Amino acid sequence: MAVEIELKARLDDPAPVKQRLFSLGTYCRSYGKSDTYWAAGGNPSSEVRVRREIDTEADGRVWEKTLVTYKIKEIRDGIEINDEREFTVSETGPDEAGGDVFEGLLNRLGLRPFIRKEKQGWAWTVGTPPVLAELSMVKDLGWFLELEILAEEKDERIIAESRKRLLSLLETLDIPPEWVESRPYTEMLKNGKA
């Protein structure tokens, strides 16, 4: 079971952060992510995300995939700790309707789409063990930097160390801690608040 430990910070100007990430980290890819969130009767514990993603790797290879994710989310002091489960419905080349077929199944099971999110940006890894840094333009919300560490288990010591590393990297990137956004994107999009 992988546990995501992550934070996101709102940015006014992504250019200086992008420049610092190129000097601090290893560039991985550019991406476009189109997410549809599904739930049964507004029940948050039934939420499922279907993500259609196109990645252009640093070496120029292009990947298309449809991922399905559900998670148990906890937020502590602006840091998300997610027990995330994810699987691929289709990968590489055209979607071949894999995502459409899966969304048809969700519909038959009584789930309905309740929010959509579009995100484009770039990804780097920084340090060892790696922190994934994604610089994203989220449609209708603006620019964000997301920093994420994957842990093997939900251990309090590991969570505390990871939180410290994420906040330290935020400081290295000259991003004030008050720019950390603790609300999930879905909440911001639902409430129409950027």
Q: Model-predicted segments: where are they?
A:
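N-terminal strand-loop-strand beta-hairpin
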Residues: 1-129, 176-180, 184-194
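A short, polar/proline- and glycine-enriched secondary-structure boundary/capping micro-motif
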Residues: 78-83, 145-146, 157-159
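Conserved, surface-exposed functional patches that form binding/active-site neighborhoods
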Residues: 109-156
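Mixed-charge, glycine-accented linear interaction segment located at domain edges/termini
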Residues: 154-184
